[in-house]
Amino acid sequence: MRVFATGVLTTVLSLPAIAAERPTDTSLYWGDTHLHTSNSFDVYLFGTPGSTPDTAFHFAKGEPVVSPTTGVRWQLKAPLDFLVVSDHAEMIGSIPRLFKGDPVIADTVTGRALLKISPDQTVEQLQQVYDQIVLIGSGLEDEADIDLSAKQLIQDIHAGEKRRTTWDETIEAAERHNDPGNFTALIGWEWSAQPKGGNLHRVVFMPEGADVASQFLPYSALESTDPEDLWRWLEETSEKTGADFVAIPHNPNISIGLFFPTETLSGDPIDAEYAKRRARWEPAVEVTQIKGDSEAHPLLSPTDEFAEYETYPFVLTPDGRTPDPTEGDYVRSGLKRGLAIQAEVGTNPYKVGMIGSTDSHTGMSAVEEDNFAGKGQHDTYPEQGSHPTGLGSSKGWDMGAAGYAGVWATENTREAIVAAFKRKEVYATTGPRISVRFFGGYGFEKADAGSADIAAAGYRKGVPMGGDLAVGEGAPSFLVAAMKDPVEGNLDRVQIIKGWLDKDGKTHEKVYEVTWSGDRKPGTDGKLPPIGNTVDLRTGRYTNDIGEEALMGVWQDPDFDPAQPAFYYARVLQIPTPRHSLLDAIALGVDVEDTGRPATIQERAYTSPIWYTPES
């Protein structure tokens, strides 16, 4: 364990009053809020008809299952604590019913049109069905090969009670597997809007059970692709049923600039009402998952040497677009935009915590690099790594083995897990179960980093990740503690990323090194030398001869200006370890360069930010 403190530390001051009461007796729970089964149209069309919610829950609980994609036994190394089966609300369950010959679906204009282009249900034919549905559902009907309107598709295989049976089965599965105190099965779905091809997807879940969930059908992008309509529906349905919804956006990296916008989808300036609605319903963002990492991009954060991580530019439309990144596509840029918008309208619409989840379409939350089940049927086997996935122009090896959500909750129940999301006391990892505590305040000392109970000091003197710093005396200080995943690589370093808004309304960012392994010293540019790399490229094995099992530190902002709004979050980096594509390349006997991906990666964790807002 290494304990480190940087910055000029202040003497202990009385902590200013914190705005909201927060629990202090929290434990770490691991989960996945984004998992698909064959009730999702794309899972079925990608050739995985045997994936069920029951399979997903059994797998998440650590039980061995027969893989729906390979037919072999698959099992997590350690169980998860919670799971959301979040099948696409659009046509939920309808595609399996179509190909099983259910006349309610098959004997319609849409059903007949889709069956006509897939008479034998070959891989190519099912991909064609998928492409047509995506184009029509995205408002790109003119580019489709079949003469079918979105209105007709909705009427035939989505509208009315056509989804009721599958939704009820989804609810029943969650009720069967929910075991308060041991395993939490949350009821949820995915709203899968992609107007003009830009990803605006949200996963929605709630702490309530069947008595509430059975009162509605999940809102989908076939009702509206505008997130403002989703928020209105959440508000209205919450008032009618008592559902305490949470909506989690994901994959801003493929949103073509629409995710953290400066104007609404309809082209109006963002106003206070928009900002308040978004902030109310969306407390966190899924920053890392199989379809890439959305924390930062090297073109947007050119001075950040670790911004180049699992970049994934492949928009989901069949045309194969890979647009350049914009500030609307990445979370760090979005956090900065939020500060600027708050200065204009009084509310920060992008005041979000960060989590990871899988977006697995295999029915299994399997994202360990050496136990990766792939995104779906098209990239499950090593030899499929160079093959198209059916998702835009991506190939199997473009998929990253990520991620999970770490949640600091009072207990493992639906209510406590959702409460932690709402107060943003959650964080993201790219897969390894790195334990991270992060607190901000005005009285942390070096001794706090060496305390036997860091959490007690953190809660007593400050606010945890997701919190707001009240205005205090002097510059704020931050207490961070990270411990490695017991079966993964050691830790390289802990950094704090700061973003702020200056007096001229311009935003800035900076990466600070806080604590690190070994005797390295930062250079004149503030950057640390690389830690090294123990990965054997012939075998895919590595050793923990470098790095530390735990890193703790206290850091005080040396550039603090009390007049500038700011956010701070911690990023924890592992030592280099083999990427799943390296292991595939070794197994296949091909050059790792043929995968188009790096041989090794530095897995990481991102905490939710802590915000500072001047009184004025």
Located regions from the model:
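Substrate-binding cleft of extracellular glycoside hydrolase catalytic domains
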Residues: 100-142
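Long, well-ordered early-domain segments
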Residues: 89-90, 125, 129-184, 198, ...
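Long, charge-dense tracts
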Residues: 205-207
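C-terminal functional module detector
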Residues: 20-53, 57-60, 67-116, 156-159, ...
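Positively charged n-region of N-terminal signal peptides that target proteins for export
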Residues: 1-3
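Conserved, charged catalytic cores of large soluble enzymes
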Residues: 210, 220-225, 310
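Bacterial N-terminal signal peptides
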Residues: 5-16
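Short loop/hinge segments at the start of secondary-structure elements
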Residues: 226-238, 254
